[in-house]
């Protein structure tokens, strides 16, 4: 007798393998989305440095409100900017993650940023 097709055991093995692959891939995908959100926040902070320096070149001071001169990426909340004696600090958050990113220019650090002009997230 010539039977064509798959046995129940073969089909169960395929389903188990697909389940294992999905269990590995889904957490990695979620981590990739988190990295993308952090990258967009860092990019916005780097762009903020450029906008602040352009404002400083015109006005010889930093500002807490750049108005239409600066726009954030979709989903990024902020920036919250504070001027200091010799610079400024800023932080942003994202609507889909609990992490925040900060940057500072001058001598007044804002956690988690610990190097001037370099955005850092926590």
What are these regions (language model features)?
Residues 28-45:
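Aliphatic-rich helix starts adjacent to a transmembrane/signal segment
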Residues 46-122:
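Periplasmic/extracellular, small/polar-rich flexible segments of pilin-like filament-forming proteins
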Residues 15, 42, 49:
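Conserved catalytic core of two-component sensor histidine kinases
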Residues 10, 39-42, 114:
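Compositionally biased non-globular segments, especially hydrophobic aliphatic-rich helices
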Residues 23, 31-34, 50, 54-57:
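Regular, well-ordered alpha-helical segments
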Residues 1-29:
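N-terminal single-pass transmembrane signal-anchor helix
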């Amino acid at each position: 007798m010539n039977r064509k097709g798959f046995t129940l055991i073969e089909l169960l093995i395929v389903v188990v393998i697909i389940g294992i692959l999905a269990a590995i891939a889904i957490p990695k995908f979620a981590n990739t989305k988190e990295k993308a959100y952090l990258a967009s926040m860092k990019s916005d902070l780097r762009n903020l440095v450029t906008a602040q320096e352009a404002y400083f070149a015109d006005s010889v001071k930093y500002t807490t409100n750049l108005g239409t001169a600066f726009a954030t990426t979709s989903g990024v909340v902020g920036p919250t900017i504070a001027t200091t004696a010799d610079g400024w600090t800023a932080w942003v958050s994202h609507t889909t993650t609990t992490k925040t990113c900060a940057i500072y220019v001058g001598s007044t650090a804002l956690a988690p940023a610990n190097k001037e002009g370099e955005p850092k997230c926590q």
